[in-house]
Every structure is written in C-alpha cells, then in structure tokens.
C-alpha cells in the first residue's frame, strides 16, 4: 500500500505510474494529484490491453511494462481495489494502491 508521502514523491520518480481511476467528471470537480494519469476504472482493462503507441496517444504517456511500479488512486480508496485486481489479472506485478486516495491527498494538501 502506498502512503501519502510516497505519492507526493512520485514526480521525482518518472518510472512510477500514478493512475487515477476516477471518472473525468470527478477530476473536473475536484482536481487531481500531480503526475497522475487518468484512466477511468471502466476503461482500465481495455487500456492495459492497448498496444504501446495507442496507449501513449490516448493517455499521453508510454504504456507501463508488466514490472513497472504502478500506484492506483481514486476518491476514497474503494475503486483502487478493483483496479489492482484488473492490473494483476493482466500480469502487472508491481502494483499497489493508495488507500487514502484523493480524500486524504486533498486533506493533507489543504484543498
């Protein structure tokens, strides 16, 4: 499980993928954690099956390798459990969740 401190440090680790699985409308209402990429939960399975160039075109970042460090975040820490399950079922082995997710981030950042 990732901590607030680890998530805050993600911009210093370009090899780490911080994936926010909230819907786009939620991000527009609340904002997002810096360095995160948005892949809504209902798109995640399909997104992780895209080829590298299609993934980069859609999400603006190269597709994670199966062993790339991935941290999933959402609003309150529930959807990340499903995201973790999806990624692991596709062979991604270095996956953790940020249980505090946006709610903890916003509180600690004073947002």
UniProtKB/Swiss-Prot annotation:
Residues 12-110 form the Rhodanese domain. InterPro entries: Rhodanese-like_dom, Rhodanese-like_dom_sf. Keywords: Stress response. Pfam families: Rhodanese. The keyword Ribosomal protein does not apply. This is Rhodanese domain-containing protein CG4456. It comes from Drosophila melanogaster.
